[in-house]
């Protein structure tokens, strides 16, 4: 299983006031809020953690069929700016984030070794959806392959 998320930092800066009253309380646990406050760049930390939660949520939704908005139940465990885990209800997902000047991209997987198996999809490949969850069909085996798609602002992955 895989999940991914992209945050357009330019768009986030323009459209999301993460410093507004109670914003952090609604989305981040106390431990995560400490990471944000103590960070060299708190704004980047906010969107890094948010991206990790979103990527992990995509796997959780795919595994359980549960849809909803419950960011406080998704808890980030931060190793460093690029690696960590996200846990929810006894499930743990591994995350890998890439921070660039104008974006943060996070990929989440259920097993660390799956990071090595991730491939980009040719834009010409037809992506199908079942219950809102995207997949492709392998031409040879006819097996369904799970995919994860993110697009926000000027980015698509």
Regions found by a protein language model. Give the residues of each.
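Core catalytic alpha/beta fold that binds nucleotide/phospho-ligands
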Residues: 1-157
């Amino acid at each position: 299983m895989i999940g991914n998320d992209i945050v357009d930092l330019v768009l986030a800066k323009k459209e999301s006031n993460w410093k507004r009253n109670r914003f952090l309380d609604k989305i981040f646990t106390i431990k995560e809020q400490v990471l944000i406050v103590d960070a060299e760049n708190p704004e980047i930390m906010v969107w890094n953690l948010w991206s990790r939660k979103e990527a992990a949520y995509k796997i959780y939704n795919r595994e359980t069929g549960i849809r909803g908005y419950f960011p406080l139940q998704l808890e980030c465990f931060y190793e460093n700016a690029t690696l960590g885990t996200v846990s929810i209800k006894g499930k743990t997902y591994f995350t890998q984030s890439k921070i660039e000047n104008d974006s943060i991209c996070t990929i989440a997987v259920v097993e660390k070794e799956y990071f090595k198996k991730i491939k980009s999809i040719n834009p010409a490949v037809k992506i199908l959806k079942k219950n809102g969850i995207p997949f492709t069909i392998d031409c040879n085996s006819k097996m369904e392959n799970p995919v994860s798609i993110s697009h926000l602002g000027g980015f698509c992955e």
